[in-house]
Amino acid sequence: MRHSLLTAAAATLLLAACQQQTKVAGSTADSPASDILYNDRDTSVSPREDFFEYANGGWIKAHPIPEDQSSWTIGHAIQEDLYVRLRSINEESLKASGGIEKKVGDFWYSAMDSATAQSQKLQPIAPELDAIAKAGDLNSLLAVMADLQVKGVGVGYNAGVYQDAKNSDVMALYLNQGGLGLPNRDYYFNSDARTTGIRNGYQQYVRSVFAALGADSATAQQKALAHLSLETRLAKASRKLEDLRDPYRNYNKMTVDALNSLCPSIRWKDALQRQDVHGVDTVIVGQPEFYKELDAALRGTPVPVLQDYLRFHLIRATAPYLDSATYGSYFTFYGKTLRGANQPKPRWKRMLDLEDNLLGEALGKVFVQEFFPQEAKDRYTRMVEDIRSALKERIQQLDWMSDSTKQKAYTKLATMKKKVGYPDKWKDFSAMKIERQPLVRNVFAANNWWHHYEVNKLGKPVDRDEW
């Protein structure tokens, strides 16, 4: 599992900030000068009419949503301080000659090398585009699809390694519906004005991708319509959001042989082996009807349309790491039209978000050395144990709970894992091949590392200590 440094560190900074608050001399119970909640009120609003605005309106007015955000909370404000600290760590790591600091520094170098990205345009993904062009039949395209999955480009379907929902002691391979460029099936079929506008914006974006690949206006439009037709077919076979909430309907364990019968075109044994998934004889399929239709779509769609489908999703997945024109088209749709942000974050913040996703624990190791000493971890660990002791006392005082039930509650309380500040054992990223090369190649390398890290868990007990 990828651990988010930004989330964990922001929580740590929030704890520290709360701990440092002290009551200002002269404040009263009615108007505590240091009471953030008190000062964030909007007293022009009656709490009887709109309690939310009364309680939060002052803070909302004082903190307008930035142009590069679609929402803004106190958590975002804390994260701004964290961004500055992480940027400082990265800049210092540029000088490192070895260790995890060098890996962090090399990633930051490629992430901030916008000049190379601008000059190379789509060249960094030329190997993948060439592989798609050379795949002249369905089986060859499916091999490319498997390779793209390993690199983090989601095409066709979603696969992941998670705890088995019916046997939480082991890890299992899950296969779920996917392969769409819009968030879920509703975006393909709802007819309200907002969804229709998003769908039209998506068509324009798809057309712009094919134009960037060299198609003239008419051909780009034709390719976009064919692409949308394929995705709409997959969306129609996908379950609605409310149907995805049923854990029993979305848990269908079957053998790989049964999966081959359900969706034979993918030839799952070959596909899994190509993705270095070995020794797996059962999988958990979330939506079997989707895989049945996926099989029909793969068999019934012309190879050139499938090639364009892979090309589009390759560029969609890598656009944030390429030149400004490619990213600009991507942001216009996914950032502005879909998400509501008026402008993108500064590049350095976007790259920190990316680094957090791919190298969060590596960056975190450097972060805690500078900003979160062992003494802080020990202090918060004691706080967790104090909470555990308080819960035990409360259980002891319950008169409605039997002694036998209390014993079970004590056992559960004692076995609850505490994870404070940072892991006791850090992941080993030494095999992740990060170099001073085009950013997208580092992204592929990191995703490849994470893919193999996850599939290596299959069939093994759950690591309860993993962050």
Task: Indicate residue ranges for each PLM-predicted region.
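Intrinsically disordered, low-complexity linker/terminal regions across diverse proteins
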Residues: L262-S265, I284-P288, L352, D356-G360, ...
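Bacterial signal peptide processing site
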Residues: Q19-Q21
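Active-site-surrounding "flap" and adjacent substrate/cofactor-binding loops of secreted or lumenal enzymes
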Residues: A29, T43-D50, Y54-S119
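Short, Gly/Pro- and small/polar-rich lid/capping loops
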Residues: V24-N39
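C-terminal motif of bacterial Sec signal peptides marking the signal peptidase cleavage site
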Residues: L14-A17
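Noncatalytic, helix-rich "gating/capping" subdomain that lines the substrate-entry/channel surface
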Residues: S93-R382
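Bacterial N-terminal signal peptides that target proteins for export
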Residues: M1-T7
